[in-house]
Amino acid sequence: YAHQRFKNRLVCQRTDGGLTAALDPSLRRIGGTWIAWGSGEADREAVDSTDAVAVPPECPAYRLRRVWLSSDEVRGAYRGYANQVLWPLCHITLDRVAYRKSYWQHYVAMNRRFLETVLDELRRRPGQAVWTHDFHLALLPGMIKRVHPATVVSVFWHVPWPGPEVFRILPERRELLEGLLAADTLGFQTVSYAHAFAECARDILEAAISPVHEQAGLPLPVAQGELFAASGVCAACHMNMVDDSGGDVSIDSAWR
């Protein structure tokens, strides 16, 4: 959701995108908090004292909690490291990778911004589970676990995962893998992507991943895509997380 000014009125619009189309119906049914970057021109006007707003406007069902990013973080983390480094690398279009060391610094800073908001939500509503999404927040699971090791953290990776021969060209390959492996469950779109991630963990971190864990997602966080069906957003899985912990926080790296 994005808030805009139209003829002196504050207007809330549901944004397009696969993640919104998948998650919004689930959150309408079960409630929770969606933490997302606030990039709408009037998003700051719409929030309360906790930087949150109830959505959808016509029938509020869950909270949308905003994270405010600086212009440097948007350029360096979102447009830079996420979209010019990780996205083309994961799609193995290496000629499109535009790496700058400063991008990584901003990427770390953006993940810390989201961490601050997650920790505030966990203070306000202890015992919630956290579900993070996509390549913009690969460091966040590890950051959360260092502060709240008992918090259930799950991840769904919405793009391909390359094999170790490609992924190892990243200078920050270890940090990214360690951040993701801190999660309790890690889901991919296909079984082959899960296998590729497992190979990277073995090759780069020398991690021990058994075939059972790699296939079933137990307890090491490598799961088949079927466990987190992207098209249906796995309402059942999301419900299980809520039932286990008494609440949930759904984190989208940014997208409203």
Where are these regions (language model features)?
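Catalytic cores of carbohydrate-active enzymes across secretory and cytosolic contexts
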Residues: 1-256
